[in-house]
Regions:
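Start-of-helix register in tetratricopeptide repeats
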Residues: 4, 37, 71, 105, ...
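Short coil turns that delineate tetratricopeptide repeat
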Residues: 33-34, 66-67, 101, 146-149, ...
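Register position in tetratricopeptide repeats
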Residues: 15, 48, 82, 116, ...
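Canonical positions in the second alpha-helix
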Residues: 28-29, 61-62, 96, 141, ...
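Hydrophobic/aromatic packing residues within the alpha-helices of TPR/SEL1-like helical repeat arrays
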Residues: 19, 26, 52, 59, ...
Length: 404
């Protein structure tokens, strides 16, 4: 078969995706009919049937003559790319790029190679070296963007990285660029909503979360994020509505119960706040210090001091021993009429407090306990300390007197 006829036959079979027939035909040819172009077509056919190792073997048989051609390097790069050996693929595609820098297919492969190399880098929160390595690969990908679709892909991935590295301003810019180029899906609006939330641009964050929920109305993570955003904006009724949607869809998580409880607390509905906080605590099994502290505060607030004491003891087991904890403990003990114990807790709180307003409040409570114990001399001495604190802080004298 003449060379031109053979190449035409190969082209026709390739157009019909009959790549195995191409392989069988070329491998059945006598040696004298083979040349580098035909062997290159054999390698191409092996790539198309996903036998990349064989493609590399075939290409290496003509390496001496073809290693400085774009097509040979392109095919070697393709083979290594699909074998996920991205470093080798990079080597060959860079050679191909240097030979034909305007070829868009080469640029597309290089962009994909650098994104994949970036994804292969494993890093932790404090692993700055590997974070930088992952980012540098992704920034290289940016040099080879071609179409709007490739720009969207690259900007989106870079934004994902910058969000992970908490560089939310850069992530915001990249996500908005991707949207301006036409990306309008669940991921992009969820990612931008999260990013804007971290930047405290809550109204704008909400817009993107609401667009995302239009696309995926049953996405419980989105519903909880929308609820959280409403809650941060002080729109507690709307937050509750979204949290209950998530709950109805089966998202019976500690997070959702806590958010519902928090909203009810802010709406001064302490009974309902307690109900949902207690549901959350069943899940956390008395391990969430913040949640136990909220329960203490609520029980103290509705004068259920025995219940408050129960959760104070749980907090104590977890090691909480700051000024807030001791002051709440003291308040609870006053409610239980255990004034001497309350005094000790407030004294302990004072040892850990630097805020003048709180120091004055704790001393006032100690004085109050002494008065209830009919230890009037001690009460007077303690209240003198309060006055000394007030008068000793001339800058805030007026404010502190008003507080006292």
């Amino acid at each position: 078969m003449k060379k031109d006829t053979l190449l035409e036959k190969i082209k026709d079979l390739s157009d019909l995706d009959k790549h195995q027939e191409i392989i069988d035909m070329i491998e059945g040819l006598p040696t004298e009919q083979l040349n580098n172009e035909i062997i290159g077509q054999l390698a191409r056919a092996y790539i198309n049937v996903q036998n990349y190792e064989k493609a590399i073997e075939v290409l290496k048989s003509i390496e001496k003559d073809e290693k400085n051609t774009m097509l040979w390097n392109y095919r070697m790069g393709c083979s290594y790319f699909y074998l996920k050996d991205y470093e080798k693929a990079e080597e060959y595609f860079l050679k191909a790029y240097n030979l034909e820098p305007e070829d868009e297919n080469i640029k597309d492969f290089l962009m994909d190679i650098y994104i994949n190399l970036s994804k292969q880098v494993k890093f932790g929160e404090d692993d700055l070296d590997n974070q930088k390595k992952a980012l540098n690969y992704a920034l290289k990908a940016k040099d080879y963007m071609t179409t709007d679709d490739k720009k969207i892909e690259c900007y989106s991935y870079l934004a994902f990285l910058y969000n992970k590295f908490t560089d939310y301003h850069t992530a915001e810019d990249l996500l908005k660029r991707a949207i301006s180029l036409g990306r309008d899906d669940l991921w992009i609006h969820s990612e931008l909503g999260y990013c804007l939330g971290e930047l405290n641009k809550l109204e704008e964050s909400l817009e993107h979360y609401l667009r995302a929920i239009e696309i995926a109305p049953s996405n419980t993570w989105l519903l909880s994020q929308i609820a959280w955003t409403y809650r941060c904006l002080g729109r507690y009724e709307e937050a509750l509505k979204e949290n209950f949607k998530a709950l109805d869809l089966g998202e019976k998580s500690e997070w959702v119960y806590v958010e519902i409880g928090y909203c009810y607390k802010e709406l001064n509905n302490y009974d309902k706040a307690l109900k949902y906080y207690l549901e959350a605590n069943k899940i956390s099994k008395d391990k969430n210090v913040w949640l136990l502290s909220e329960l203490v505060w609520l029980y103290n607030g509705i004068k259920k001091y025995e219940n408050a004491l129960e959760y104070l003891k749980k907090l104590e087991k977890l090691g909480r021993d700051d000024s807030w904890f001791n002051s709440e403990y003291g308040f609870c003990l006053i409610g239980l009429k255990k004034y001497n114990e309350a005094i000790e807790k407030y004294k302990h709180a004072l040892e850990k407090e630097n805020n003048l307003k709180e120091i004055i409040r704790y001393n006032s409570q100690i004085g109050f306990c002494y008065r209830l114990l009919e230890k009037y001399e001690e009460a007077i001495e303690n209240l003198k300390k309060v006055l000394e604190k007030i008068n000793g802080n001339k800058k805030n004298d007026k404010q502190m007197r008003r507080f006292f």
